[in-house]
Amino acid sequence: MFETTSDFVWQAIQPRPRDAHKGTFGSVLAVAGSASYRGAAALAVEGALRTGAGIVTLASVEPVLAAVAARLPECCLCPCKAGAEGGISPQNIEHIRRQKASVLLAGPGLGYTAQSAARAAETRALVKTLLPGFSGSAVLDADGLNAAADLLQTEKMLHPQGELILTPHPGEMARLTGHSAAEINADREGTALRYAKAWNAVVVLKGAHTVIAGPDGRCAVNPTGNPGLSRGGSGDVLAGMTSALLACGLPAFEAAACAVYFHGAAADRAAALHGETGMLPHDLLDALGTLFAENGR
C-alpha cells in the first residue's frame, strides 16, 4: 500500500505531444442522466472534457441533452427515447451501441429504486446489455453500481472487453458485497483489495482518504480533498474525470489513482476560494484548468 503523491500523478500525465489530435486522447461515451437527475450527467461529461478526453458523447433523454448542450457545446449528443420516470429506455440499446468510443461511463443519474421498480429494471437492462458487449474499457458509477449489485445476486461481475473501474461510496459497496457500511469502513483497504481481486476490476472506495485497489494487489490511499466534497454531484465529476484518463490511454489503476488525486486537489483549491461549506461540485471543474496549467499540462 502507498500514498498517492504529486510525483506519481505528474509522471503518469505527460505533457501533450505537439502533433496530437483529438483521436490521440480517446473518446468517452457517457450513458447518464434522467428527468430527475439532469445535473449528474452534466457534471460527469464536463469532468471528462476538463480532464482531457478527445471526444465526449452523452447518451441520454432530451431534457438532459438540452441542459448539457446549453452549457457544453463541446459535448456530442446521442438522443434517447424516455422510459420509466423519464430515464433512458432499454429500447435505445442498439442505438447507443452504434456510438463509437474507447471508454463507456455508465451510471450517473440513470435513476433506480428511489424513482420506481420500473426505473430500476430499465437501468439493470441497460447495464446488463451494454457492459458485456462493449469493446473498450468502462467505468461503472452511481446507479450503474446499484444495477450491478442486483445483478450480482444471480451472476458474476459483468465486464467489458477492456478494463473495468468501479467507483462506489461505502453505501454502494455495502450493496455490492452484502456487508454493512460500518464493516467496510472498519477495513477499507482490505475490503477494496479483496473485491478488486474477486471482481478483476479496479475498485475506487470513496470517502475520506479514498482507497484505490487493483486486481494485481496494488493499493493506494489518496491524500487530497476535504469535507466540502460531501455533497451530491462530487462523485459524478470524479466518474467523468476517471473516464477521461482511461480514454487518454492510462491503465485503469493509474487512471483511477490520478483522477482521485486531481479531484481532491481541485476540491482543496475550491475550498480555499469558497470554503468547505460554500463550495460546489462545479467549482472543482473551474479549478482543474488552473491545476493542469500550473503543472504544464
Annotate each PLM feature.
Residues 177, 223-229, 239, 268-276:
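Short beta-alpha connecting loops at secondary-structure transitions
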Residues 174-175, 231-262:
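Short, small-residue alpha-helix embedded
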Residues 1-22:
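Positively charged, low-complexity intrinsically disordered leader regions
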Residues 21-85:
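Substrate-binding N-lobe of the ribokinase-like
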Residues 265-297:
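Charged C-terminal helix
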Residues 1-6, 59-224, 296:
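Glycine-rich phosphate/dinucleotide-binding loop and adjoining beta-alpha-beta core of small-molecule
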Residues 17, 219-233:
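Short pre-catalytic strand/loop immediately N-terminal to key active-site residues, enriched for Gly-Thr
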Residues 42, 46-47, 128, 193, ...:
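Alpha-helical segments flanking ligand/cofactor-binding loops in enzyme cores
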